[in-house]
Amino acid sequence: MYVVSTKQMLNNAQRGGYAVPAFNIHNLETMQVVVETAASMHAPVIIAGTPGTFTHAGTENLMALVSAMAKQYHHPLAIHLDHHTKFDDIAQKVRSGVRSVMIDASHLPFAQNISRVKEVVDFCHRFDVSVEAELGQLGGQEDDVQVNEADAFYTNPAQAREFAEATGIDSLAVAIGTAHGMYASAPALDFSRLENIRQWVNLPLVLHGASGLSTKDIQQTIKLGICKINVATELKNAFSQALKNYLTEHPEATDPRDYLQSAKSAMRDVVSKVIADCGCEGRA
């Protein structure tokens, strides 16, 4: 009962006018901070992992950790495959118990994107697994995938409806001006495009590349239909910078149980702020 699909989470968010944050985890400490903070704020959250994260930690290990922590805190959690591209990889993880998948075929031409996504949807829905897909493509780097800004393109609102109907997806990730990674300057988000997409598509919408966005921008996207906010780089940066600072100030430190506390504290600040920005505190 504790490891759940994201479908009900996102449908609840759509009805309630808030968003559910999906935090990309990279190690045990990241997961601890996300779950502990979410439980203390009674907020729904999604534990997301790229293919690199699942390779690093092991699918069975991640599933066991999420299940154990959900039970420990009596807090339902979803574990989500972020930016997965290979059908066989997705199928193996679904059979291991994952109940939320993002199939990313956004780099393919429109018809091929539909075909690849529909194959995954048809398989996943047999296991009551929710499926997210992306139309349009964000710039920046996610895991081992690098997309140059010149190759990034925005979601076409009319195509979005055709894509959603043809694939049977449960949520749609849109490209409206965000990018993976942190921003050198504030991005100019295309809110009118997002509003048009919302008019064409009634599915929960997903925003990738939210690290570093202002509270105002995040909350405006939620008003216009975003139900899931993805955060990865902001957590990594908080962790690594706090750790570097601590070890610079305490070069004699050798015990990870001590020096990782500063990194956890920095991530806790990020997680609590994102939950507040999403308006999901008290919604679990």
From Swiss-Prot:
Organism superkingdom: Bacteria
Top EC category: lyase
Keywords for the protein's UniProt record, in alphabetical order: Galactitol metabolism, Lyase, Metal-binding, Zinc
Pathway(s) of this molecule: Carbohydrate metabolism; D-tagatose 6-phosphate degradation; D-glyceraldehyde 3-phosphate and glycerone phosphate from D-tagatose 6-phosphate: step 2/2
Residues noted as binding dihydroxyacetone phosphate in the record, renumbered to the chain: G181, G209, A210, S211, N230, V231, A232, T233
Cofactor(s) needed by this chain: Zn(2+)
Stated role: Catalytic subunit of the tagatose-1,6-bisphosphate aldolase GatYZ, which catalyzes the reversible aldol condensation of dihydroxyacetone phosphate (DHAP or glycerone-phosphate) with glyceraldehyde 3-phosphate (G3P) to produce tagatose 1,6-bisphosphate (TBP). Requires GatZ subunit for full activity and stability. Is involved in the catabolism of galactitol.
Complex formation: Forms a complex with GatZ.
This protein's name: D-tagatose-1,6-bisphosphate aldolase subunit GatY
Source organism: Escherichia coli O7:K1 (strain IAI39 / ExPEC)
Lineage, opening ranks: Bacteria, Pseudomonadati, Pseudomonadota, Gammaproteobacteria, Enterobacterales
